[in-house]
Structure formats: structure tokens, C-alpha cells
């Protein structure tokens, strides 16, 4: 009977400990759950394009989970899930040389183009949530919603914006020194 009581105390302690970790999400747990790769690239392009490093990391995580080889069914490529047509336009704006789709497989180029695009959207909309909505659903959709005096009309895009905002807080807390805070 004493062994059973001791076992129940141990199990209860483990369950309570696990609940504490899941609920409080200490930085070590967040780092295990939400990795940060390509730190120098993220920090460098965040600085170059006046982006909050945690925001850039959050977008990358949401788009690709830091998988440089990620591909979407819509044809988006790489860490920041850029469409080739969008990236080609960005290459022209940034003075890049001849654009090749394979450039998007390069983490440095992908994050550079994605950072430029995110900065462009932030400047255009003057609002982080609208910029994130445009990153996810496209500028045309956001412009249409705004012209009609409406908010974000796609539930997927509302979820995307909320998720990136949450991830930004996670990355800011878990990787403060790595991201230069």
C-alpha cells in the first residue's frame, strides 16, 4: 500500500510539473518547441530592413518552420515562402542580378527578399496586422477589404496574423540575447 501511495505521489508530481511547463512555457521549453535557425541572417536582415528580429523569426517559423527546402502547394518556396513572381519583382527593386527561381533555395537570399517585402508591407499599411495579412493573403485582398471598410475577411488569414503575433512574443522572450534584445 505504501508503494502504491508513493507511486501516486510521484505520478502526481510529474503531471503537475508537466502542466506547469506547458502552461508557463519557460524560455528553455519555448526554445525546444520553437527553434531559431539562421540567427545571423535573421539579425542582419532585421537590422537592414528595420524589422523587429522577433517578428522576422515569427514569420519564418510560421511560413516554413525554418525549413529552407519548404515548398507549398501554391508554389511558394523557402524559409519565407515567397512566390517566384513576387521574388522576381523584389529582385528588381533591390538591384539584384538576374533572378533565378533557385535563388529562393538560398536562405540568405530568401530572407533578404522576404525582409524587404515585409518592410514594404509595413510601410504601405503602417500597421503590423495589416502587413501580416497582406503577407499571407496578398495585397490585393487587403486593399479590397480596406476599401470596403472591412477587417480581415479570411479566417485563415486572421489565424495567421494571431499566430505570428503570438510567435513574435515567444521569440522575443525565448531568444532575447540571440536576437539582439
What spans do the regions from the language model cover?
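Hydrophobic membrane-insertion alpha-helices, especially the h-region
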Residues: 4-21
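Catalytic glycan-binding domains that act on GlcNAc-containing polysaccharides
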Residues: 19-181
Amino acid at each position: 500500500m505504501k508503494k502504491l501511495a508513493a507511486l501516486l505521489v510521484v505520478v502526481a508530481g510529474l503531471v503537475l510539473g508537466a502542466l506547469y511547463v506547458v502552461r508557463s512555457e519557460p524560455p528553455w521549453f519555448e526554445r525546444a518547441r520553437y527553434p531559431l535557425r539562421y540567427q545571423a541572417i535573421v539579425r542582419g536582415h532585421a537590422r537592414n530592413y528595420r524589422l523587429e528580429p522577433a517578428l522576422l523569426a515569427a514569420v519564418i517559423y510560421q511560413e516554413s518552420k525554418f525549413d529552407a527546402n519548404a515548398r507549398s502547394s501554391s508554389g511558394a518556396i523557402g524559409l519565407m515562402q515567397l512566390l517566384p513572381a513576387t521574388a522576381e519583382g523584389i529582385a528588381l527593386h533591390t538591384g539584384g542580378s538576374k533572378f533565378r527561381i533557385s535563388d529562393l533555395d538560398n536562405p540568405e537570399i530568401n530572407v533578404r527578399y522576404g525582409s524587404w517585402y515585409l518592410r514594404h508591407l509595413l510601410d504601405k499599411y503602417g500597421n503590423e496586422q495589416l502587413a501580416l495579412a497582406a503577407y499571407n493573403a496578398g495585397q490585393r485582398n487587403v486593399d479590397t477589404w480596406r476599401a470596403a471598410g472591412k477587417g480581415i475577411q479570411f479566417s485563415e488569414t486572421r489565424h495567421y496574423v494571431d499566430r505570428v503575433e503570438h510567435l513574435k512574443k515567444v521569440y522575443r522572450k525565448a531568444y532575447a540575447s540571440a536576437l539582439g534584445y
